[in-house]
Amino acid sequence: MFRVLAIGNSFSQDATAYLAQLAAGGGVEMEAVNLYIGGCSLATHWENMQTGAAAYERERNGASEGRTVSLAQALEEGGWDAVTLQQASHDSGWPERYFPYIRLLAGEVRARVPGARVWVHQTWAYELDSDHPAFAQYGHNQSAMFQALEAAYHQAADSIGAPLIPSGAVIQRLRSLPPFDYAHGGRSLCRDGFHMDRLYGRYALAAAWYECLMGQDVRDNPYTPSPEADAGLLALIRETVHGVCAEQRA
């Protein structure tokens, strides 16, 4: 079994909602655990690591287990193959807000779970008309927010020698395609202006995580998250995910 632990917030909750099920579609048995605190930043994760606060709701394969744990407790379960780190979306475009916390957290993860590979999960830019209070930091401009977080995430990942899961780049690429071009009548990939749509948005994130973590071509994966899903849109998402991930590997 491949075990992945996401140290995150509601954005990693979106990313892991379908991940284990999609992996099963590719013949991979996976346990995807998300440590959830809403809006949690790298600075707060580091504070919680130091204090040992049992502040994280433990979610397994997209569902809450109804219990809280500390970071140390989760890491010391052992058996993790991958551990992901991410910045809170509101801080994602500001490189100085990643440090020193991402280096400190990566060091703790590697010390406590030496068999795990550390990954950085790139979050995404808000929807064009998002009313998220932090959108003002980016001039209420989705493109500006994406460009800022793209640069910041690559800098952060490089600083700790960790590969990047390019979720933000995947979402931005999809937004350039007619079915998801919200500015011109396409459907939004967000459900509330910043969290992912529960069908296609979450599916796109799971596909990106699967292709990166497992190194498998998601275009070959038959998993369908809902009978209501449009097969053509799912295929477009898989093709887009594969393209973005291939560009990153090149």
Predicted regions and their residues:
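Conserved SGNH/GDSL esterase-like catalytic core that processes O-acyl groups on lipids
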Residues: R3-L5, F11-F99
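Conserved catalytic region of serine esterases and O-acyltransferases that act on ester linkages
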Residues: G186-A250
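Alpha-helical cap/lid subdomain in secreted, periplasmic
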Residues: V69-R198, E211, D220
